Amino acid sequence: MIFTESTALENQKSDTPKLSLQYEQIATDTHTLRSLDWDRSRFDIEFGLRNGTTYNSFLIKGKKTALIDTSHLKFKNIWFEKLRQEINPTEIDYLIVSHTEPDHSGLIKYLIDLNPNIEIVASKVAIKFLEDQIHQPFKSRAVKSGEDLN
C-alpha cells in the first residue's frame, strides 16, 4: 500500500518534495516501511539516481518487537502516521540501528520522545554518535558483529 504526502505530478517541478511510503509484509511477523524519496538525484556524491531512492525500516514482531532503522527527517509526518496505524510506538522494545547516516537515523530522537523506554541497539560508535546528536538520555545496548539480541 502506498501513502503519499505530495500531490505534485511526477514530471512537474514543485517546492513540495515527492515523498511516499509503502508498507508491506515481507515474512511472517515482519513488515517493511519503505520511504520513497522520488526527488533525490544523488546517492553519496558519485552515484546519480534516475528514479529517486528508498530508505527502508523493518518491523519485526515476536516475543519482543524490534524496529530496524527509522527514516530521513523529511518523512517525519507520514512515517510516524503510518507507524502509529500499525503499532503503538510504546510497544516497540528495540530500535536496531544499522548505521547513523541521516536517511536511517533521522527520526530516532522523535521515536525516543514517543517511547522513552525503547532500547537502542547499535555499535558502540553509533551509540556515542547518537548521544552527541540527540542530547537526551536513552536506553542503549552496544553490540558487536555476530552477537544475538535474543
Describe the residue ranges of each PLM region:
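Cytosolic, low-complexity regulatory segments enriched in Ser/Pro/Gly with interspersed Lys/Arg
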Residues: I2-A8
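Metallo-beta-lactamase
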Residues: L9, S14, K18, E24-T28, ...
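Conserved beta-strand hairpin/beta-sheet module of binuclear metal-dependent hydrolase folds
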Residues: Y23-Q85
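Short glycine-/acidic-enriched loop or helix-start segments at secondary-structure transitions
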Residues: R42-F43, L107-I108, D132
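Active-site metal-binding motif and surrounding structural segment of the metallo-beta-lactamase
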Residues: K63, K74-V121
